[in-house]
Regions:
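Glycine/small-residue-rich phosphate/adenosyl-binding loop
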Residues: 27-31, 35-101
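Short secondary-structure boundary segments
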Residues: 77, 121, 147
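Active-site helix/loop module of the DD-peptidase/beta-lactamase fold
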Residues: 119-136
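Structured binding elements
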Residues: 113
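A glycine-rich helix N-cap at a beta->alpha junction
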Residues: 66-73, 132-154
Length: 173
């Protein structure tokens, strides 16, 4: 798939088939996240692969938005390495970096004809407890992954995009 096709056809999948995701495809998705750019190349992303029944039972207690996907990535970032101090910049970039990583993985999944959705609705305290997430790790989001069900369709809001002149300005607002 070429890049234009990837970004134009991707949508948030909320209904998955039971077909498992092949390990080689998961590896490609994780590799896309590994090589994603991060501020100062600090690489604060930390990813838990949720793939077995026991882990999914825990996920189901943490969010209603698992959509019965056969695979799910729990994306965190390590706050102790999130700063880019190379040029005296003290701003924390962990959330931005982990978002870039998650987006790269999402686009690679689309390239592999897998569906995804970025989930921000979850109970962080339960996730932290159930998956032993250290205190210095911040939870960014969940990404269910799988083959879209035969009747999966984009939500009504998917195609509602602003015109470019509503969001892009040249040289000043």
């Amino acid at each position: 798939m070429d890049y234009d096709e990837i970004i134009k056809t991707r949508y948030s999948v909320r209904k998955y088939s039971e077909e498992p995701v092949e390990q080689d495809k998961l590896n490609k998705i994780l590799q896309a996240g590994r090589i994603a750019p991060t501020a100062g190349n600090r690489q604060p992303q930390r990813i838990i692969v949720i793939e077995n029944e026991e882990a999914f039972e825990k996920i189901k207690q943490c969010t209603p938005c698992h959509f019965n996907a056969p695979l799910l990535l729990l994306v965190c970032y390590d706050k102790s390495v999130e700063n880019n101090n190379h040029y005296g910049d003290k701003r924390p970039y962990g959330q931005v970096d982990a978002s870039i990583v998650l987006t790269h993985m999402m686009l690679e999944a689309q390239n592999l004809e897998l569906g995804t959705v970025w989930v921000g609705l979850f109970n962080p305290a339960l996730l932290r407890e159930y998956f032993h997430i250290p205190n210095n790790y911040e939870i960014l989001g969940l990404m269910p992954i799988g083959y879209p069900d035969m009747d999966a369709i984009p939500s009504k809001m998917h195609s509602e995009k602003f015109l470019i002149d509503h969001t892009v300005f040249y040289n000043s607002f």
